[in-house]
Regions:
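Generic beta-strand/beta-sheet core signal
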Residues: 3, 40, 50-51, 71-73, ...
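Structured nucleic-acid-interacting core domains from mobile-element enzymes and related host factors
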Residues: 27-51, 118
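RNase H-like nuclease fold core
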Residues: 50-92
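Short helix-interrupting loop/turn segments at helix-coil junctions
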Residues: 1-2, 32-37, 57, 118, ...
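Active-site-proximal structural scaffolding
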Residues: 18, 28-30, 63, 102-105, ...
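RNase H-like nuclease module associated with reverse transcription
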Residues: 46, 76, 82-201
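C-terminal reverse transcriptase regions that engage the nucleic-acid substrate
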Residues: 1-36, 170, 178-180
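Secondary-structure capping and boundary motifs in well-ordered enzyme cores
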Residues: 14-18, 42-43, 62-63, 90-95
Length: 201
């Protein structure tokens, strides 16, 4: 998905290299036509979000890419890969913005699940940056964080309300990694499997 999003950024003025990348994506899709998302029956209706960011990944404007995904039970139900609207000055800021995007989706899904009489609180949001996690717990502005736009601090508000609970996860187990950058083949296949994208026929 990340490669599709990168190619989409150049729709207005594509180059030969973009066509080569799109052909490679189409070749991958043709080779994995028998793959799909696996939704096993009988899983508990628990929700968990994963957020990650590729700090300054865009070579043109140095904006970071946010990647998020959400599992209901053990099944992938929501994902997104998007370039951030502003330039982050640190990895912490980029990860904090990505976690905010993840939190917004968690809140929407929480409301949808309440329509089915499923009530969830303290929904875990997994992040692999301890500084970003600490920023959600500390309301005091420091010189290194005071420039962060107010709209990104709604994450802290919802953590304090108990809607979601941001937790540390080791980078090796960070499922959202696949939505932020190109990965080595073995790592890509590992995350694809962990997300429940399997050969189904």
């Amino acid at each position: 998905m990340q490669s599709v999003c990168v190619c989409a950024r150049y729709q207005s003025s594509p180059r030969e290299s973009h066509l080569t990348a799109v052909k490679r994506i189409l070749k991958y899709l043709k080779g994995t036509a028998s793959f799909g998302l696996w939704y096993p029956s009988g899983t508990e209706p628990s929700l968990v979000g994963f957020s990650d960011a590729d700090y300054g990944g865009c070579k043109i404007d140095r904006k970071s890419t946010s990647g998020t995904c959400h599992l209901l039970g053990s099944s992938l139900v929501s994902w997104h890969s998007k370039k951030q609207a502003c330039v982050a000055l640190s990895t912490t800021e980029a990860e904090y913005i990505a976690a905010g995007n993840c939190c917004a989706q968690i809140l929407w899904m929480k409301q949808q699940l309440e329509d089915y009489d499923i009530h969830l609180d303290h929904i875990p949001l997994k992040c692999d940056n301890t500084s970003a996690i600490n920023l959600t717990k500390n309301p005091i502005m420091h010189s290194r964080t005071k420039h962060i736009e107010i709209r990104h601090h709604f994450l802290r508000d919802h953590v304090q309300k108990g809607d979601c609970e941001i937790k540390y996860i080791d980078t090796q187990h960070q499922l959202a990694d696949i939505f932020t950058k190109a990965l080595p083949k073995d790592r890509f296949y590992e995350l694809r499997r962990d997300l429940g994208i399997l050969k189904i026929f």
